[in-house]
């Protein structure tokens, strides 16, 4: 997988949402190809839409299916990709087979993301994708998110974070783009409920 140096610029906080969107699209255009981890939430859906718009068929959105992922979330993703014509695939992950995940400790999300990114790493290598990205935003850095550690370990990119995009800005830009996920509430996986 190609290494990519993330750009964090303090001036991004002075940019308008539209300027941050332009920065995001410029960053995405630098990739020869990209896999986007698409959960169906507002952030990952916006990232998938932006990557598809910039990269076309060079972008592939991928959703992991497992017992932790709800049928409702799957239906949301199916509708989203059908409506927007986003290139997409479902894959299976097996985090439930990991005793550390099943222990249900505070870092459970780490093991889920580690499984997801391991499967996506293999997919990227086998199919020649240059990078993997996920939909973490600038607000997510304020919370305890064990999945971020897995992303760092797997060198997964965070284009929304790199563009300085916050959740309200992503919702605004998603609404402007007509994305059906713009106002989708954040929800935990079935293992967290």
Residue spans of the language-model regions?
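Histidine/lysine/aspartate-rich catalytic loop segments that bind and position anionic ligands
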Residues: 166, 175-193
């Amino acid at each position: 997988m190609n290494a990519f140096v993330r750009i964090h610029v303090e001036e991004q906080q002075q940019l308008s949402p539209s300027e941050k969107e332009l920065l995001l699209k410029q960053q995405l255009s630098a990739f020869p190809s990209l896999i986007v981890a698409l959960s169906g939430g507002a952030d990952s859906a916006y990232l998938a839409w932006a990557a598809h718009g910039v990269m076309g068929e060079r972008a592939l959105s991928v959703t992991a299916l497992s017992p932790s992922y709800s049928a409702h979330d799957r239906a949301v993703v199916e509708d989203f990709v059908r409506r927007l014509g986003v290139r997409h695939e479902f894959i299976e992950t097996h985090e439930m087979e990991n005793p550390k995940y099943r222990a249900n400790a505070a870092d459970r999300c780490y093991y889920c993301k580690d499984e997801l990114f391991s499967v996506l790493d293999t997919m990227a290598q086998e199919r020649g994708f240059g990078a993997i990205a996920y939909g973490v935003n600038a607000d997510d850095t304020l919370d305890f998110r064990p999945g971020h550690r897995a992303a760092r370990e797997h060198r997964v990119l965070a284009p929304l974070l790199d563009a300085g995009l916050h959740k309200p800005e992503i919702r605004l830009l998603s609404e402007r783009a007509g994305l059906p996920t713009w106002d989708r509430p954040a929800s935990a996986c079935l293992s967290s409920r």
